[in-house]
């Protein structure tokens, strides 16, 4: 892959410049604490930890982002706030006001890298937003099982299927359990202690 379109390269370049900027400040946020960069119109280099993004209207989780990452670019100058960011673990980050970030990106010719980061953000967020609007419990469960199956093996083996689905949807635990039992009975999936260990082709 061309290094100019490699998201990891773009994150590295942008994050290094944010950290070096004299106007950036370092912050540590505890697990469960909100990160107010969207409300404060800021961007941040997430140096360590994991953050989750939630819809304001109902608190549903729409995405999870691991360090290293540049966060906040997709929400700069939002007219109506729709999401908030919360720390899933203790996080450390370098934070910069968006207006200064704009000047920095221009001075250091970082706009192409910023574009790749925003594009990646939209790519991972929009499909997950669609999951929330599935019409039936079966559709919701199946789509989330596919998403879990796409995770790396270590993360998949530690992901609770019920927590994963319930945190992202207004759906009852009993409805999820019913679909899971049906899928297990038909041989489409295999579970072990609430974790997904096998996923076959599901219509």
Question: At which residue positions do the language-model features occur?
Answer:
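Glycine- and acidic-residue-biased ligand/ion/polar-headgroup-sensing regions
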Residues: 40-59, 67-69
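Structural motif
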Residues: 42, 50, 90-92, 195
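Surface loops and adjacent helix of pleckstrin homology
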Residues: 48, 56-58, 76, 96-98, ...
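Polybasic "coupling" helices that flank or enter modular domains
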Residues: 112-170
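Phosphate-/nucleic-acid-contacting segments
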Residues: 147-203
């Amino acid at each position: 892959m061309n290094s100019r379109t490699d998201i990891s390269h773009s994150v590295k370049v942008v994050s290094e410049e944010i950290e070096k900027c004299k106007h950036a400040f370092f912050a540590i946020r505890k697990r469960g604490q909100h990160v107010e960069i969207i409300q404060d119109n800021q961007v941040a280099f997430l140096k360590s930890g994991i953050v989750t993004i939630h819809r304001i209207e109902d608190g549903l989780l729409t995405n999870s982002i691991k360090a290293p990452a540049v966060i906040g670019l997709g929400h700069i100058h939002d007219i109506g706030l729709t999401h908030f960011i919360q720390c899933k673990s203790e996080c450390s980050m370098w934070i910069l006001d968006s207006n200064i970030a704009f000047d920095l990106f221009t001075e250091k010719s970082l706009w192409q890298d910023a574009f790749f980061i925003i594009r990646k953000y939209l790519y991972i967020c929009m499909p997950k937003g669609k999951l929330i609007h599935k019409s039936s419990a079966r559709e919701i469960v199946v789509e989330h099982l596919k998403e879990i199956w796409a995770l790396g093996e270590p993360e998949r083996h530690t992901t609770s299927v019920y927590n994963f689905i319930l945190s992202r949807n207004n759906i009852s635990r009993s409805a999820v359990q019913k679909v899971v039992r049906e899928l297990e009975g038909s041989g489409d999936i295999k579970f072990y202690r609430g974790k997904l260990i096998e996923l076959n082709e599901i219509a």
